[in-house]
């Protein structure tokens, strides 16, 4: 079943009867929206059996079918194609190479105050 737009003319003179008519129509499955004027015109939109709705409403008040139309889906305008956006990906930052901590050179040397010159007795100059 396709969605229909039905306009009904109701002879309603009291607010209480108007509320009962709205509740009666809203109980049908497939009803999308219901609007009602003060003049008594009720507009029903949805996938609903219109003669069944009229039969229920005739138990409350005098009801006439004014028009029944198929609901046309709204025409979508084709959207202009957007140019592909260039996505700027973040540049991965390389961390500087982490060197091991430098250790102090630790070698032992004699202090300069203890140095002495040794004359070798083997050397003979004649």
From Swiss-Prot:
Lineage top rank: taxon: Eukaryota
Presence of the UniProt keyword Lipoprotein in the record: yes
Prodomain positions: 124-126
Residues annotated with Cysteine methyl ester modification: 123
Tagged with keyword Ion transport: no
Lipid-linked residues (S-farnesyl cysteine): 123
Domain HMA: 3-69
GO molecular function annotation: metal ion binding
Regulation: induction: Up-regulated by cadmium.
Annotated S-S bridges: none
Keyword terms: Lipoprotein, Metal-binding, Methylation, Prenylation
Protein family according to the UniProt entry: Belongs to the HIPP family.
Function according to Swiss-Prot or TrEMBL: Probable heavy-metal-binding protein.
Protein name, per record: Heavy metal-associated isoprenylated plant protein 14
Organism: Arabidopsis thaliana
Gene: HIPP14
């Amino acid at each position: 079943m396709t969605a229909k737009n039905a306009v009904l003319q109701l002879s309603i003179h009291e607010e209480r009867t108007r509320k009962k008519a709205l509740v009666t129509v809203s109980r049908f499955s497939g009803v999308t929206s219901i609007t009602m004027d003060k003049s008594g015109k009720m507009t029903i939109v949805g996938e609903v059996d219109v003669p069944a709705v009229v039969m229920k409403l005739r138990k409350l008040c005098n009801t006439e079918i004014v028009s029944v139309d198929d609901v046309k889906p709204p025409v979508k305008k084709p959207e202009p194609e957007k140019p592909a956006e260039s996505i700027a990906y973040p540049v991965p930052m390389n961390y500087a190479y982490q060197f091991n901590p430098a250790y102090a050179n630790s070698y032992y040397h004699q202090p300069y105050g203890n140095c002495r010159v040794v004359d070798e007795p083997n050397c003979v100059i004649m």
